[in-house]
Regions:
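Rossmann-like dinucleotide-binding domain for NAD(H)/NADP(H)
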Residues: 2, 11-13, 17-103
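Short alpha-helical donor nucleotide-sugar binding micro-motif in glycosyltransferases
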Residues: 5
Length: 103
């Protein structure tokens, strides 16, 4: 959402590895290009593969922009790690513990 992006700190780095549509891609491009946020790291897009006229292509060469293809999920090791993390999270929850907190 454009308003949320506008409220970010100037040194904030937005990472989107969820879904491309979660973020307003055009607003992110504007915020990075105008140096209103520190940068972005993205491996999910509203349309894949990225077309030459996709908004991210305007900022792709900037040092504070990291655009990667969304391929990590396919690896066997990634699926094993996901299951292991899920089990650890469930065990921690059942024990009343907190994991992976960002405060």
């Amino acid at each position: 959402d454009r308003n949320l992006i506008a409220s970010m700190k100037r040194n904030a780095i937005l990472i989107n590895v969820a879904r491309g549509a979660v973020c307003d891609e055009e607003a992110l491009v504007e915020a990075v290009a105008q140096k209103r946020i520190g940068g972005i790291g993205v491996d999910v897009y509203t349309s894949e593969p990225l077309a030459a006229d996709h908004p991210y292509m305007r900022i792709a060469g900037l040092p504070n922009v990291c655009l990667t293809p969304h391929m990590a999920w396919g690896a066997y090791e990634a699926r094993v790690r996901c299951v292991n993390e899920m089990v650890a999270n469930i065990r921690a929850f059942c024990a009343g513990e907190r994991r992976n907190r960002v405060d």
